[in-house]
């Protein structure tokens, strides 16, 4: 396997598509520094799967996309394709064997999306990595050696150097398999841990479910016994409540009569009491009015007495307050005179301080004015200085700009001249490319049209197949709906049929004796002389089922036997086994029966003779005639009454609704109960359901067959459609690729044409620009001279302003010192004046307070004297009216006592009547309470009966009334049975929550546990197998590495003297490193030196040693190709010659691609590619075959 071709588009500096074709032997890539030669190496590494942007000399992977230049915009995609020629000796993956060429492609879009392709088919990065495993080719293999990596080989750690020999030994694919096995083993360990956790959990659940299942079985037995006791107790309690209810109704009538009599007497006495109470209330009102009058007089007397006492006390207190106020007033007037003298002294002191302070303040204002003038001058000088300095900076900046502009203008004129010369050559090249691209675009356009036609045909066929598949899916959906509907219908009917058959088979609802006899007889009933129940052997017209059921009644569950003796035998059986009761009908002889009745159907409402509407087997015809020979079916009750009243023949009349009129006058009607109800209907329903089930099953099978047919058709159609979609996708990809090529060809052509036009315009612009530059250069020289003169003048003015600013600073410091001294003196005088003013203000405030107090005391003395005179007058008036009110109070109190005695007598009479009324009313209340208690008890009984029935219905899903007949003849529960029920309830409650599904869950969980246990064993076995596989891989890897190491060491020892012209070198295995594997150390002894570690050699010696190691590896495991990037750079002329000899020798086995600057290395190349950068930032490719060009072109190639 060798490289045939390398296609680069939009990768790094290769904006346009560049194609490198590599033949056998040696291919050289040359060019000046920075032209993009190493980008070729990066492109090969990148397309082979390199994922590190750092290894590609970038910060991020998007850096590999062409990022634009001065004249070219950035591209949106980078694409590199590497084509290999494959021969029979190459060991590739099975899917790539048989190909003569393999093309690996990688694309990266600026939005971050990427694609990997092998032979134009999308694949994974892993597929590309596996393609090169064990071949020595790869991003980290020894087939690609850059200049930096040469030094890295000799300076890296022994453990890292080991990777080269592992690649040569083919160990990398084993390590990849080992890592895959380890990952698989980790996943298996995780699965085993998960399965173990699940099985452990299942073991716990199994133990719990086992206990729950046993508990559930015990629970069912307890509940069955509790149900029987519960029903027995409930039925007897219902009978007791019903008896109590009847007794209460009798008592209710007796108490009602007595209550009515007592109520009449209560009403009469109540009227008398009401009249007497009205009279007493009037007397009470008069008594209260008189009492209120007495109370008013008494209160007035007490108030006057108290008022006189308070007046005297207030008079004394007022006199005392007036005397005290007069004393205080005299003292305040004396203090006021003293305070006026102190205020006059403080005012004199304050006047002296104010005169001195004003003189100091005037001096301070003069100093402040001086300081303000100096500060204003400083500000003006500083502003002018700043302006001059800013102008000086601006002048200097302009001067520097003009001087720089002169230098730039000179350089630009030189660049313009070189550019004009280059444009002429580029225009000629572009015109030739334009014609070539025109031809390419025509060829691609034809291929695109052909592919579009094929894609359209595939799309049309795919549309037809999709339509057919849509129709098939619609039919399948409709059929699926019908299948589901029929399945549900069939399930419902089967369930109903099974239920009815189970009821019929188990004789559910029939008497216990009937069930016992029929169950005992089983399927051999006929052999035992038992024909079955009456309901089982007859078939009735559906219209008259209800009428015949009503006519037969309980006889429907009579057992038909062959003889009377058989009937007696069965009765004995029931008695002997305590299996309840049963009725048995022997089949009579036909000649012993009377002739059947012939009804008159001409009468209105007479519908049918029951005997004619019933069929049975011939042997049982006499029995049916016996049962129904005299039964006539009529329309309704009115028809039956008309038959009887008209004197019709004696017979049993039955209406279609089930009312029965018997010859003896008995009339039967209402809702039927018991086992016979609906027996004939159930029997007919069973037959109809069986027929319906058969019909639905037949239809279901037909639909199901069609379902499978449509499913197969749909699967086939989906397969065809999938194939078409795959073909269409392939053609679409092909079309997209071709359209991309067409678009690219168009873009290339447009770009070339646009470039030609741009270059022509640019050539004209260059001439104009050259003339403009000359004029601009002359103007810049004048500006420089003017700027220099301006700068000198401004520098002189700045010096003068700085001197003036310093003088003003000293003057300001002096003025500021004087001002500070004056401010201190003024502040001291101000402080003394403030203290004196505060004392004066305090005296003024005290005098004002004192004057206010004097005014208030003078008012108090005047008002107090007036108050004393008023109080003395009021006390005299109060003493005169007090004796008159005392006499009025005495007379009113005597009248009140007489009125109270009369009121007491009347109240006693009313109380006696009230006692009689309460006694009679109490009796009425007792009667009403008794009636209420009886009514309440009746309601309680009704509620208890309802609750009892609801409880039985809820607990056992049966109606208590239907169970009454089973228990009412039995004795009440014995005390020990009640105790047993309590014990059963206690056991059930003690059992706690019961999982009734535990048995089924236990079985299902056991099954799952067994399955997971088997899975666990399989996982454990798988882990052991993986461990063995890893051990085998390790053993094989160690063996192959050791063999390769020995051979490479031998070759290295032979090559080293050839490269150095003598000396010796070898490889040594070091102790095992952190990974448990030994490293590889290099020791070398160049000619004339001691044996030493390779790290101690010079740069050139290190490079040559590394080359020797690589060539040693090549001798035992040559790779399909080898790419050496400036490996010869550190070598001198002699070493380069020996290096080239080795390359020529090994190029017979492998393909060599050399990137070099060395002319001697170029000479050994069969083909040279020159990489140039005629336009900044864009690499361009030229090539020469050395054997065709000859030595005469050597200088030209080197220049490229």
UniProtKB/Swiss-Prot annotation:
InterPro entries: P-loop_NTPase, RecF/RecN/SMC_N, SMC, SMC_hinge, SMC_hinge_sf, SMC_prok. It is found in: Cytoplasm. One of its GO terms (cellular component) is cytoplasm. Residues 763-795 are annotated as: Disordered. ATP binds at residues 32-39. It comes from the Bacteria. Residues 528-644 form the SMC hinge domain. Keywords: ATP-binding, Chromosome partition, Coiled coil, Cytoplasm, DNA-binding, Nucleotide-binding. Disruption phenotype: Conditionally essential, the primary defect in an in-frame deletion mutant is in chromosome segregation and organization. Cells are temperature-sensitive; they grow slower than wild-type at 25 and very poorly at 32 degrees Celsius. Increased sensitivity to DNA gyrase inhibitor novobiocin, cells are longer, and contain 2 fully replicated chromosomes that are not completely segregated. ParA, PadC and bactofilin BacP are less organized than in wild-type. All these phenotypes are stronger at 32 degrees Celsius. Synthetically lethal with padC or triple bacNOP deletions. Residues 171-219, 252-342, 679-706, 735-762, 1002-1039 form a coiled coil. One of its GO terms (molecular function) is ATP binding. SMART domains: SMC_hinge. Residues 772-795 have a biased composition (Basic and acidic residues). A conditionally essential component of the chromosome segregation machinery. Required for chromosome condensation and partitioning. Important for positioning of ParB-parS complexes (ori of replication) and of the ter replication site, as well as for segration of the ParB-parS complex and thus chromosome segregation. May act via the formation of a condensin-like complex containing Smc, ScpA and ScpB that pulls DNA away from mid-cell into both cell halves. Belongs to the SMC family. Homodimer. Probably forms the Structural Maintenance of Chromosome (SMC) condensin-like complex with ScpA and ScpB. Contains large globular domains required for ATP hydrolysis at each terminus and a third globular domain forming a flexible hinge near the middle of the molecule. These domains are separated by coiled-coil structures. This is Chromosome partition protein Smc. It comes from Myxococcus xanthus (strain DK1622). The lineage of its organism: Bacteria, Pseudomonadati, Myxococcota, Myxococcia, Myxococcales.
């Amino acid at each position: 396997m060798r490289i045939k071709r390398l296609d680069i588009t939009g990768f790094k500096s290769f904006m346009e598509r560049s194609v490198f074709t590599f033949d056998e032997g040696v291919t050289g890539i040359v060019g000046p520094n920075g032209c993009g030669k190493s980008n070729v190496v990066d492109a090969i590494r990148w397309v082979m799967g390199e994922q590190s942007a750092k290894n590609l000399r970038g910060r991020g992977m998007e850096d590999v996309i062409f990022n634009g230049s001065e004249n070219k915009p950035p591209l949106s995609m980078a694409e590199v394709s590497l084509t290999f020629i494959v021969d029979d000796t190459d060991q590739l993956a099975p899917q790539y064997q048989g190909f003569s060429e393999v093309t690996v492609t990688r694309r990266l879009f600026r939005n971050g999306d990427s694609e990997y392709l092998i032979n134009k088919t999308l694949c994974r990065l892993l597929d590309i990595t596996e393609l090169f495993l064990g071949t020595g080719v790869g991003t980290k293999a020894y087939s690609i050696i850059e200049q930096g990596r040469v030094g890295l080989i000799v300076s890296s750690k022994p453990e890292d150097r080991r990777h080269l020999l592992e690649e040569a030994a083919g160990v990398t694919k084993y390590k990849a398999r080992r890592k895959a096995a380890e990952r698989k083993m980790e996943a298996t360990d995780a699965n085993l841990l998960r399965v173990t956790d699940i099985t452990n959990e299942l073991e716990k659940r199994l133990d719990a479910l086992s206990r729950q299942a046993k508990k559930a079985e015990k629970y069912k037995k307890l509940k069955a016994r509790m149900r029987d006791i519960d029903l027995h107790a409930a039925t007897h309690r219902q009978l007791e409540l019903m008896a109590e209810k009847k007794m209460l109704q009798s008592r209710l009538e007796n108490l009602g009569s007595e209550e009515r009599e007592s109520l009449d007497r209560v009403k009469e006495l109540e009227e008398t009491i009401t009249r007497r109470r009205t009279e007493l209330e009037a007397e009470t009102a008069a008594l209260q009015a008189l009492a209120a009058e007495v109370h008013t007089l008494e209160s007035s007397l007490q108030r006057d007495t108290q008022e006189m006492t308070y007046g005297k006390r207030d008079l004394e207190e007022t006199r005392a307050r007036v005397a005290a106020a007069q004393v205080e007033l005299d003292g305040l007037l004396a203090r006021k005179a003293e305070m006026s003298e102190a205020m006059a002294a403080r005012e004199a002191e304050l006047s002296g301080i104010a005169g001195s302070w004003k003189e100091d303040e005037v001096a301070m204002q003069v100093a402040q004015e001086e300081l303000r003038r100096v500060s204003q001058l400083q500000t003006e000088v500083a502003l002018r200085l700043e302006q001059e300095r800013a102008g000086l900076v601006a002048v200097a900046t302009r001067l520097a700009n003009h001087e720089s502009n002169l230098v730039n203008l000179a350089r630009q004129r030189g660049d313009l001249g070189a550019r004009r010369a280059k444009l002429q050559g580029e225009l000629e090249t572009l015109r030739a490319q334009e014609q070539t691209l025109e031809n390419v675009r025509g060829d691609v356009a034809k291929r695109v049209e052909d592919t579009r036609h094929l894609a359209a045909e595939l799309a049309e066929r795919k549309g037809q197949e999709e339509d057919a598949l849509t129709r098939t899916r619609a039919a399948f959906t409709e059929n699926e709906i019908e299948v589901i509907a029929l399945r549900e219908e069939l399930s419902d009917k089967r369930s109903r049929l099974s239920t009815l058959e189970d009821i019929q088979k188990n004789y559910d609802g029939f008497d216990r004796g009937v069930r016992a006899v029929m169950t005992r007889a089983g399927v051999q009933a006929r052999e035992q002389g038992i024909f079955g129940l009456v309901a089982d052997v007859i078939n009735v017209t559906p219209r008259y089922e209800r009428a015949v059921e009503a006519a037969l009644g309980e006889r429907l569950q009579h057992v038909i036997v062959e003889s009377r003796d058989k009937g007696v035998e069965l009765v004995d059986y029931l008695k002997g086994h305590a299996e309840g009761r049963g009725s048995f009908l022997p089949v009579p002889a036909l000649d012993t029966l009377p002739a059947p009745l012939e009804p008159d159907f001409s009468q209105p409402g007479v519908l049918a003779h029951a005997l004619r509407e019933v069929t049975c087997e011939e042997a049982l015809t006499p029995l049916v005639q016996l049962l129904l020979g005299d039964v006539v079916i009529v329309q309704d009750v009115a028809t039956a009454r008309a038959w009887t009243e008209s004197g019709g023949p004696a017979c049993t009349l039955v209406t279609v609704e089930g009312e029965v009129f018997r010859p003896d006058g008995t009339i039967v009607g209402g809702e039927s109960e018991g086992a016979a109800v609906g027996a004939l209907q159930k029997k007919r329903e069973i037959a109809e359901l069986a027929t319906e089930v058969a019909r639905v099953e037949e239809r279901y099978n037909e639909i199901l067959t069609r379902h499978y047919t449509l499913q197969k058709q749909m699967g086939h159609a989906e397969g065809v459609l999938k194939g078409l979609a795959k073909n269409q996708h392939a053609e679409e990809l092909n079309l997209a690729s071709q359209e991309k090529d067409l678009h690219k060809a168009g873009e290339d052509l447009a770009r070339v044409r646009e470039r030609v036009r741009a270059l022509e315009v640019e050539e004209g612009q260059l001439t104009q620009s050259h003339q403009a530059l000359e004029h601009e250069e002359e103007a810049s020289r004048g500006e420089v001279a003017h700027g220099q003169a301006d700068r000198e003048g401004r520098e002189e003015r700045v010096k003068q302003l700085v001197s003036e600013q310093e003088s003003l600073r000293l003057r300001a410091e002096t003025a500021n010192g004087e001002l500070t001294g004056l401010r201190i003196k003024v502040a001291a005088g101000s402080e003394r004046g403030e203290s004196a003013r505060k004392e004066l203000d305090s005296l003024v405030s005290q005098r004002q307070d004192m004057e206010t107090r004097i005014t208030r005391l003078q008012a108090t003395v005047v008002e107090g004297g007036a108050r004393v005179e008023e109080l003395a007058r009021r006390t005299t008036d109060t003493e005169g009216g007090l004796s008159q009110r005392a006499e009025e109070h005495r007379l009113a109190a005597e009248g009140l006592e007489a009125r109270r005695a009369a009121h007491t007598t009347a109240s006693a009479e009313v109380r006696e009547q009230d006692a009689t009324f309460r006694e009679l009313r109490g009796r009425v209340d007792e009667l009403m309470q008794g009636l209420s208690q009886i009514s309440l008890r009746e309601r309680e009984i009704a509620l208890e009966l309802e609750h009892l029935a609801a409880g039985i219905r809820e607990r056992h899903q049966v109606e208590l009334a239907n169970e009454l007949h089973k228990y009412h003849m039995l004795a009440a529960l014995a005390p020990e049975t009640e105790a047993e029920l309590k014990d059963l309830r206690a056991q059930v409650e003690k059992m706690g929550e019961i999982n009734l599904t535990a048995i089924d869950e236990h079985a299902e969980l056991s099954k799952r546990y067994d399955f997971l246990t088997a899975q666990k064993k399989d996982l454990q076995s798988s882990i052991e197998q993986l461990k063995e596989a890893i051990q085998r891989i390790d053993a094989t890897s160690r063996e192959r590495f050791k063999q390769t190491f020995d051979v490479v060491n031998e070759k290295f020892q032979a090559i080293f003297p050839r490269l150095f012209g003598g000396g010796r070198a070898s490889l040594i295995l070091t102790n095992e490193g952190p990974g448990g594997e030994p490293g590889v150390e290099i020791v070398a002894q160049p000619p004339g030196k001691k044996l030493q570690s390779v790290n101690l050699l010079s740069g050139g010696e290190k490079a040559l040693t590394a080359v020797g190691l690589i060539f040693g590896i090549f001798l035992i495991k040559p790779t399909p190709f080898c790419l050496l990037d400036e490996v010869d750079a550190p070598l001198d002329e002699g070493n380069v010659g020996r290096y080239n000899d080795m390359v020529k020798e090994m190029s017979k086995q492998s393909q060599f691609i050399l990137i070099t600057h060395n002319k001697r290395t170029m000479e050994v190349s069969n083909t040279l590619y020159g990489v140039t950068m005629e336009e900044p930032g864009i690499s361009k490719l030229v090539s020469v075959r050395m054997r065709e060009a000859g030595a005469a072109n050597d200088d030209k190639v080197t220049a490229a």
